[in-house]
Design a protein with these regions (language model features):
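N-terminal periplasmic "start-of-domain" segments of outer-membrane beta-barrel proteins
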Residues: 27-57
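Extracytoplasmic beta-strand/coil segments of soluble accessory domains associated
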Residues: 63, 67-107
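A beta-strand signature from Gram-negative outer-membrane beta-barrel systems
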Residues: 120-160
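Periplasmic-side early beta-strands and strand-to-turn transitions of outer-membrane beta-barrels
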Residues: 134, 150, 158, 178-262
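Conserved C-terminal beta-signal and adjacent last beta-strands/turns
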Residues: 179-180, 217, 221-229, 365-367, ...
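Face-selective signature of the C-terminal outer-membrane beta-barrel domain
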Residues: 187, 224-243, 263-394, 398-409, ...
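Outer-membrane beta-barrel signature, preferentially recognizing the C-terminal barrel domain
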Residues: 258-277, 392-409, 413-414, 418-472, ...
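Gram-negative outer-membrane beta-barrel transporters
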Residues: 327-334, 368-373, 467-470, 489-575, ...
Length: 639
């Protein structure tokens, strides 16, 4: 199959070479202008928070923003330092690709992307696409996810320096500095710490009392910089943190059962992208290197119920891609190829060094004619693992996966449909980890079918989608001889049937502006693994039937008030669907008041936030209580 990658690469080179020699007949050459964004998308369902609407939300991380999207479930393992992952339409977090400026954020070890560590302070937009976004020039990796989240860095529109200080509940202290040069460069640095010792209510058959969350602290600093020049962009990022890992609330509230596990993270990446367009041809290249280091400590001297564990993990990731497209007035042809090298080293007992080579190639055609638009794509994936112990290496994996999208657009109305079949390979943890690995795992497949209608004019946007998902050979962890030994297995079939609705409105009258958006999802996820199992047709854990959100944003002469409401219905914590494992519905209301003062050429911005205004005591994940009402105040001075 290597010949396929060679043909794609050769096609890309031929296209770019031809474009460099093509004449510009009857075309006036103008200076280069950098444009961020894509043309209107009609083919796939999408949701976006951008600009002022994004900054006015009472949110600090990407995970906080995504929870307001239709069909999204955020798994939050409690506490301000807990892991936060995203799940779209119950496909699983490892089927969701997260892209920063068009380049994927990866984790070769377990596939889980912790969205809590990515700040919104320098983001222009956060967008969610079912299937993938409708852009002419995409890398092969962008087609390799069932759903995609795009984080677009904000390009600086002025030369300025700003400093920010914030304080809040549970010992929160935040210091931030931002330096920008118009259209060229920004540097963003942040330090934050919090004790995370919030109160919670604990109820069981034998007690009903109020406790205080322990080991939920986090201290981190982050520094990143991005540069822009014509079609070239570069981004560097470094993140360092120490955090407590708040365990589940079990047995009685005593120090003996409090989790004392600690985790240290060091994350670094540098990436670049270059894009150039000629008359009918366009070319894009991406390059990225990432280094991740993690230490996990479990110390029985601080918790007698645990065993000693002090493990270190190091991951490296090197990625390169090239994409080329030919465009006419009604047809666009794209060819792209990607290559990713990932390795994992650890001091876990009897774990061998392993690295993975992942190559992808894509052929795509998009046609438009009198309001009709269609996209056909074929993705080829080849994955090979290599280990110092050859017996542990799995056989190479090669697959073709298709995608079909179609839409009809007339004035403000759009009718669209898509089908996409994709798979995810088992992670290195799934295959090779000493206690849980299973080298015989098969890839996990998802098939998506979607039919939707969309209406959009200057002020109003309405969308309605009905969808059906099918997940085969789902990779799950099950206990073996004892609770301390688990194994990864392929298990069963999951079917999902859902309906999602979104509505948005925005208007400006002089100095007054108003915007509102609402999302609602009704989704049923059931297990169809075996008719002989007692769990047959049971509801999948953590998949509520109903979920909804509303955001209202008002602005007047430098003042802005944003309120957001989030609702999640009842759901089960286990596949057995026992009443004891039923988690109740919950809802929260957040408020954010902001005022900007102009002082000569400078500005002062004061912000007051209240999260969980109604003091809702709830659990997103069973036995991981979430914070109640909490406050935050921030002051920012911009020079």
């Amino acid at each position: 199959m290597r010949i396929i990658h060679f043909i794609i690469l050769l096609f890309s080179i031929v296209i770019s070479a031809h474009a460099q020699t093509s004449r510009l007949d009857s075309v006036h050459t103008i200076r280069d202008v950098a444009v961020v964004g894509v043309r209107p998308h009609y083919l796939t369902p999408s949701q976006t928070l951008a600009g002022t609407a994004l900054q006015n939300l009472s949110t600090t991380s990407v995970a906080d923003a995504l929870k307001y999207f239709s069909g999204v479930q955020i798994k939050d393992y409690g506490g301000l330092g807990g892991l936060k992952t995203v799940n779209v339409r119950s496909l699983g977090s490892q089927h969701v690709g997260v892209y920063l400026d068009g380049i994927r954020i990866t984790n070769a070890q377990n596939g889980q992307i912790d969205l809590g560590r990515y700040s919104l302070s320098n983001m222009e937009s956060v967008a969610l696409y079912n299937a993938n976004r409708n852009e002419r020039l995409q890398s092969a990796s962008e087609y390799a996810s069932a759903a995609t989240v795009y984080l677009q860095t904000r390009r600086p529109d002025s030369t300025a320096l700003s400093v920010e200080y914030g304080t809040g509940s549970f010992g929160l202290q935040k210091l931030k500095a931002y330096l920008s040069f118009k259209n060229i460069l920004f540097v963003d640095a942040e330090y934050q710490r919090t004790d995370g010792d919030y109160p919670f209510r604990f109820q069981s058959a034998s007690e009903d009392t109020v406790g205080k969350r322990r080991n939920s602290d986090i201290c981190f600093y982050r520094i990143e910089a991005a540069g822009f020049y014509k079609g070239f962009t570069a981004h560097a990022y470094y993140y360092s943190s120490e955090r407590g890992l708040p365990g589940p609330v079990v047995r009685r509230l005593s120090d003996q059962w409090d989790s004392t596990d600690r985790q240290w993270d060091r994350n670094f990446f540098v990436q670049s992208s270059y894009r150039h367009a000629w008359d009918r041809f366009s070319l894009k290249t991406n390059l990225k290197y990432a280094y991740d280091w993690l230490r996990y400590l479990q110390d029985p001297s601080t918790n007698a119920a645990t065993m000693y564990c002090d493990n270190h993990y190091r991951q490296q990731d090197l990625y390169a891609s090239a994409s080329a497209a030919w465009n006419s007035s009604w047809l666009s042809l794209t060819a792209s190829t990607d290559l990713r090298w990932s390795d994992l080293t650890t001091d876990v007992y009897r774990s061998a060094y392993v690295y993975r080579l992942d190559s992808k190639s894509l052929l795509s055609a998009i046609a438009s004619y009198h309001g009709f638009e269609g996209n056909i794509a074929l993705l080829y994936t080849h994955i090979g693992d290599h280990s110092a112990r050859s017996a542990q290496s799995t056989a190479a994996l090669s697959r073709f996966t298709p995608m079909f999208l179609a839409s009809w657009h007339r004035h403000a109305f759009t009718v669209r449909a898509f089908h996409k079949r994709i798979f995810r390979a088992p992670t290195l943890n799934d295959l090779y980890y000493t206690l849980v690995g299973n080298a015989q795992l098969r890839p996990e497949y998802t098939s998506q079918f979607d039919l939707g209608v969309d209406y959009k004019d200057r002020h109003l946007h309405l969308a309605l989608d009905a969808y059906y998902n099918r997940i085969e050979d789902k990779i799950v962890a099950i206990p073996m001889k004892c609770q301390f030994r688990w194994s990864m297995v392929n298990f069963g079939l999951v079917k999902s049937l859902g309906l999602s609705a979104t509505a948005g409105y925005d208007r400006t009258w002089g100095k007054f502006s108003a915007s509102a958006s609402a999302n609602y999802t009704c989704q049923r996820d059931r297990d169809y693994s075996s008719p002989h199992d007692p769990e047959y047709r049971n509801t999948i854990p953590y998949s509520p039937l109903h979920s909804a959100s509303i955001i209202v944003d008002l602005g007047y002469d430098g003042w802005s008030l944003c309120t957001s409401w989030l609702y999640t219905g009842e759901r089960f914590a286990l596949i057995s669907n026992n009443r004891d494992d039923l988690l109740g519905a919950w809802q929260t209301v957040d408020l954010k008041l902001n005022k900007r003062f102009r002082i000569q050429r400078h500005s002062l911005q004061a912000t007051l936030e209240c999260n969980n205004l109604g003091d809702s005591r709830h659990e997103v994940v069973k036995r991981y209580p979430m914070p109640g009402r909490n406050w935050k105040a921030t002051v920012q001075w911009q020079f």
